[in-house]
């Protein structure tokens, strides 16, 4: 008999890890351990903010050393549990490794609204957003230097879940379905990670006119009738900041028209990995994703995809008067 594995959570600040992991632990009858709570307690004892403790930990290995050993001991115990930790995926070999993401502005809004200690208060949305980015980068750099692992690399995980618009209940149901083998088990088994993405945050790489010429009139209704779980996973690339379609524009369009907040996908390439013909994900995005393509896709689906930084787009990508260009 196979012993059920643990579930370990990492993710963006403000992505809802605590809310989701607490409920999943209750639903599955598992003990939950939060390393974030431990770090916050350590910061309060030192009268530091979480960011200050992160920066201090870059110089003082004792901070991470204590927490690392705790995680190693828990992983070695073989106990089936839910672990909320930014590095548990590195220590737990036999676990469902979940990484939760959200749009940075939405993450800042959530953090700004939740109760916090006096050391963690922010005066504005922009300050919260900037501090969250700074704190995340501090952690990322520390992990790269100390452990030689990059927490931003999606292939470290089994399941990526975007919580920008999806509610906690929907996210919880999807994660439990994946854990129990009821959601895209082939992707999880053979080619993780499984991506559960917000369709309104995925960039097209084809012109909407071309898509309309090939659109199957029944596809929108077929997707609505089937539900999002049976939807064939899209094939997706990732620049390190933006997700984009490699294959599956019609399914993505149908999901948007049906109001889905999550769609399943498999990762084709991320950052420097090749998409097609040796072209990296970053270069493919720059070659295929034009301001006019973004503008027309957004207008057709009633969404607001932001223009990426000009450096991520091809030559002359943002021109005065071009659709989607800033005024």
Where are these regions (language model features)?
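Hydrophobic anchor at the beta1->P-loop junction of P-loop NTPases
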Residues: 9
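Small-molecule kinase domains that catalyze NTP-dependent phosphoryl transfer to phosphate-bearing small molecules
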Residues: 120-171, 196
